[in-house]
């Protein structure tokens, strides 16, 4: 067990990156944080008597060496009206790396300890300032990788997820109450009214939340997009076009890329993990063979493959074999490149006649960018997240912990419905309802062990 649950300690941490910058924020919290900090603040008398939610100007003092360390602005908060629910100090100082070290060292000498990662947010949760779902949303916001994931992560801050789960819990509590009354009075001819329709609605809501995580995960972790094809087909030119900068070497000599090159780009708020692979051909040596084997492995694992074909040349053997093996593969987009040159009609006709889904065939030029907009649109329609309707106002699950608990709750609801259908004893129904309520309570934080909280909050960034 870490120091996270030692709430009597006065803690301090840098809340901004440890880099040279115009300003930095050093935050602290604890019952004695204000009097302890006042010992190293020039305007200490005003600080000790000041009300909460006030701002104070002064200097950080090194009393041992009788000198000023920095000119600062101090934000003072008094319990319970603070993020942590405790007395808190936030120091806005100049963003000097040396200055930051000196100020934090003075905090530590004054009786503070360094905060654990996520400790400020944990104290906020324990003080019932925020629900656990909102605490996890803060973590996802901080580490969002794209505009889309950031916008989706903001949604849980409204408390909609908590309200949604609370409604399901209330439905199950009604079952518990009715069963408890029945078992207490043991009236043989009394029938309990089970809210079957409400349980079905709860099942549908849980399934919707589970599906929302699958969409969020794809958006957050990124879509794997692999560029494949024979040598000198234009894969590296297409790779550089996606990135809008040169990363792959573009050359008229075939086989310039012998190993894969990886980069990321964003399209409509979705992160793409892009791979430029070695050209498919009969390998001349061990190094080339390894590169081609890796290319084949990436193609199998990809969410989407763009197979680039040089439509200005005769079709190489490797293209014949690949097209024949993958002509019905829905995750492969065949791109005929170099249409700015003289088109080889036999190559074009063979590809068109072989690929079963004509909409998965695009003609482009990476040189003059003809057909590129069509390619972008096609990529977006081929990615499965486009087929799932998810809006910024929808309730989104962005935590794997929440997802695991929701799947457990969903399985329990299915079991409950099955038992209702089989007309099992009421006490068995009550047990299942109780299990589901506890499961949902773990998501919101109403039911949580110290070990679970410790493991969750230690993954937060320092100062949060």
UniProtKB/Swiss-Prot annotation:
The keyword Magnesium applies. It is found in: Cytoplasm. (6S)-5-formyl-5,6,7,8-tetrahydrofolate binds at residues 27, 90, 129, 464. GO terms for cellular component: cytosol. Keywords: Cytoplasm, GTP-binding, Hydrolase, Magnesium, Metal-binding, Nucleotide-binding, Potassium, tRNA processing. InterPro entries: G_TrmE (IPR031168), GTP-bd (IPR006073), GTP-bd_TrmE_N (IPR018948), GTPase_MnmE (IPR004520), MnmE_dom2 (IPR027368), MnmE_helical (IPR025867), P-loop_NTPase (IPR027417), Small_GTP-bd (IPR005225). It comes from the Bacteria. Its main location: cytoplasm. Residues 222-384 form the TrmE-type G domain. One of its GO terms (molecular function) is GTPase activity. Transmembrane segments: none annotated. One of its GO terms (biological process) is tRNA wobble uridine modification. It is an enzyme of class 3 (hydrolase). CDD domains: trmE, TrmE_N. GTP binds at residues 232-237, 251-257, 276-279. Pfam families: MMR_HSR1 (PF01926), MnmE_helical (PF12631), TrmE_N (PF10396). Binds 1 potassium ion per subunit. Its EC number is 3.6.-.-. Its cofactor is K(+). Mg(2+) binds at residues 236, 257. Homodimer. Heterotetramer of two MnmE and two MnmG subunits. Belongs to the TRAFAC class TrmE-Era-EngA-EngB-Septin-like GTPase superfamily. TrmE GTPase family. Exhibits a very high intrinsic GTPase hydrolysis rate. Involved in the addition of a carboxymethylaminomethyl (cmnm) group at the wobble position (U34) of certain tRNAs, forming tRNA-cmnm(5)s(2)U34. This is tRNA modification GTPase MnmE. It comes from Borrelia garinii subsp. bavariensis (strain ATCC BAA-2496 / DSM 23469 / PBi) (Borreliella bavariensis). The lineage of its organism: Bacteria, Pseudomonadati, Spirochaetota, Spirochaetia, Spirochaetales.
């Amino acid at each position: 067990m870490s120091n996270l649950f030692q709430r009597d300690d006065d803690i301090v941490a840098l809340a901004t990156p440890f880099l040279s910058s115009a300003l930095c924020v050093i935050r602290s919290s604890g019952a004695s944080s204000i009097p302890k900090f006042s010992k190293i603040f020039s305007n200490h008398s005003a600080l000790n008597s000041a009300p909460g939610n006030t701002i104070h100007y002064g200097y950080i003092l090194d009393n041992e060496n009788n000198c000023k360390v920095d000119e600062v602005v101090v934000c003072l908060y008094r319990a319970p009206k603070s993020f942590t629910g405790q007395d808190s100090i936030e120091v806005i100082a100049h963003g000097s790396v040396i200055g930051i070290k000196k100020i934090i060292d003075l905090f530590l000498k004054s009786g503070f300890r360094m905060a654990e990662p996520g400790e400020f947010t944990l104290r906020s949760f324990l003080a019932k300032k925020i629900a656990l779902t909102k605490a996890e949303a803060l973590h996802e916001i901080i580490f969002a990788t794209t505009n889309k994931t950031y916008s989706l992560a903001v949604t849980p801050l409204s408390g909609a997820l908590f309200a949604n789960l609370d409604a399901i819990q209330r439905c199950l509590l009604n079952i518990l109450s009715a069963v408890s009354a029945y078992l207490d009075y043991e009236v043989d001819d009394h029938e309990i009214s089970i809210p079957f329709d409400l349980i079905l609605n709860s099942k549908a809501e849980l399934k919707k939340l589970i599906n929302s995580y699958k969409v969020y995960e794809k958006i957050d972790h990124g879509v794997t997009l692999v560029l494949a094809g024979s040598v000198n087909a234009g894969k590296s030119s297409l790779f550089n076009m996606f990135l809008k900068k040169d990363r792959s070497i573009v050359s008229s000599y075939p086989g310039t890329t012998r190993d894969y090159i990886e980069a990321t780009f964003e399209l409509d708020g979705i992160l793409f993990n892009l791979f430029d692979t070695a050209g498919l051909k009969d390998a001349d040596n061990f190094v080339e063979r390894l590169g081609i084997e890796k290319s084949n492995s990436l193609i199998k694992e990809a969410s989407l493959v763009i197979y680039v074909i040089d439509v200005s040349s005769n079709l190489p053997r490797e293209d014949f074999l690949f097209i024949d093996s993958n002509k019905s593969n829905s995750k492969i987009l065949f791109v005929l490149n170099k249409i700015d040159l003289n088109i080889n009609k036999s190559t074009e006709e063979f590809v068109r006649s072989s690929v079963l889904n004509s909409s998965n065939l695009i003609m482009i030029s990476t040189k003059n960018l003809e057909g590129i907009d069509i390619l972008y649109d096609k990529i977006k329609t081929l990615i499965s997240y486009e087929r799932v309707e998810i809006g910024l106002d929808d309730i989104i699950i962005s935590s794997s912990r929440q997802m695991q608990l929701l799947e457990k709750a969903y399985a329990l609801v299915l079991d409950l419905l099955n038992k209702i259908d089989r007309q099992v004893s009421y006490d068995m129904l009550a047990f299942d309802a109780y299990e589901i309520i506890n499961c949902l309570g773990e998501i919101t934080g109403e039911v949580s062990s110290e070990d679970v909280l410790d493991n969750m909050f230690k993954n937060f960034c320092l100062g949060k």
